[in-house]
Design a protein with these regions (language model features):
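Right-hand nucleic-acid polymerase module
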Residues: 1-108, 118-200
């Protein structure tokens, strides 16, 4: 995944004369919050593309009745993930997951989403039986760049950020460090010239 962008930042090459960053003074503005959300979405898109293939399971698990409190939801979610790990160990695979809990503080019922590698149909039934508080719906992840971006956008959408827990990722996910390269002024120009309309 390659991203090219222009930067208006101009910094001296010498570390001695670089201006130090000022201490944080103001609360994050709405504009900056949106910038932060987009960065989280881009990072999550890369993580999804690097760890999941087409056919991976996108699981949504719901509550038939609204739970008593947030702590109960977190405890039941943790128990569900422990069961998932056991199912995957028995299948000879690692449970590599990305998950989020939605509507923890909202008026509706909480529910969770988790992206995890696919197993067999029998294993899918075991996973559905492991969640004893409501329905378990399984959809297949498409595997393309647009699929990853759409899923990352949903996981990081403003509604989830405002009324839910943080995105959780398993420790065994592959995380290739981002490689940044500085593009010179000459390299930033278009390689092929495009004549104005009406000219050849």
């Amino acid at each position: 995944m390659v991203k090219k962008y222009y930067s208006y930042r101009a910094l001296p090459t010498s570390k001695k004369v670089r201006e130090k960053r000022a201490k944080r003074q103001n609360v994050t503005t709405a504009t900056q919050a949106e910038v932060n959300r987009r960065l989280r979405m881009e990072n999550l898109t890369r993580l999804i593309m690097e760890n999941y293939e087409a056919g991976a399971w996108y699981i949504t698990y719901t509550y038939s009745e609204k739970p008593t409190d947030e702590k109960a939801v977190l405890a039941e979610d943790a128990k569900f993930k422990r069961t998932l790990r056991r199912i995957y160990r028995r299948a000879g695979m690692e449970a590599r997951y990305i998950s989020v809990l939605e509507n923890l503080k909202g008026r509706g019922r909480p529910h969770g989403h988790i992206l995890i590698p696919a197993l067999t149909v029998d294993d899918m039934e075991r996973i559905q039986k492991a969640w004893k508080h409501g329905r378990v719906q399984v959809k297949l992840y498409g595997g393309g760049a647009e699929d990853a971006a759409r899923m990352a956008a949903y996981f990081t959408k403003e509604k989830i950020d405002g009324s839910s827990g943080r995105i959780q990722t398993s420790r065994n996910l592959t995380r290739t460090p981002v490689k940044k390269e500085r593009v010179t002024r000459s390299e930033a120009y278009r390689e092929e010239s495009t004549p104005p309309r009406g000219y050849r």
